[in-house]
């Protein structure tokens, strides 16, 4: 799921993804936006 958070590295997506999916969230930074997924 892409979320509306800008990023330059996946670390910036860590907290918003955990807020969305809980402690087992995965995160990527793609095209300057965070992508979250459940693991």
Swiss-Prot record:
One of its GO terms (cellular component) is extracellular region. Disulfide bonds join 7-29, 13-34, 17-36. The record marks 37 as: Aromatic residue of the functional dyad. Keywords: Disulfide bond, Ion channel impairing toxin, Neurotoxin, Pharmaceutical, Potassium channel impairing toxin, Secreted, Toxin, Voltage-gated potassium channel impairing toxin. Pfam families: Toxin_2. It comes from the Eukaryota. InterPro entries: Scorpion_toxin-like_sf, Scorpion_toxinS_K_inh. Blocks human voltage-gated potassium (Kv) channels Kv1.1/KCNA, Kv1.2/KCNA2 and Kv1.3/KCNA3. Exhibits high affinity for Kv1.2/KCNA2 and selectivity over Kv1.1/KCNA and Kv1.3/KCNA3. Has the structural arrangement of an alpha-helix connected to a beta-sheet by disulfide bonds (CSalpha/beta). This is Potassium channel toxin alpha-KTx 2.24. It comes from Centruroides bonito. The lineage of its organism: Eukaryota, Metazoa, Ecdysozoa, Arthropoda, Chelicerata.
């Amino acid at each position: 799921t892409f979320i509306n958070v800008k990023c330059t590295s996946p670390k910036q997506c860590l907290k918003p993804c955990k807020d969305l999916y809980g402690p087992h969230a995965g995160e990527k930074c793609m095209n300057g936006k965070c992508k979250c997924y459940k693991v």
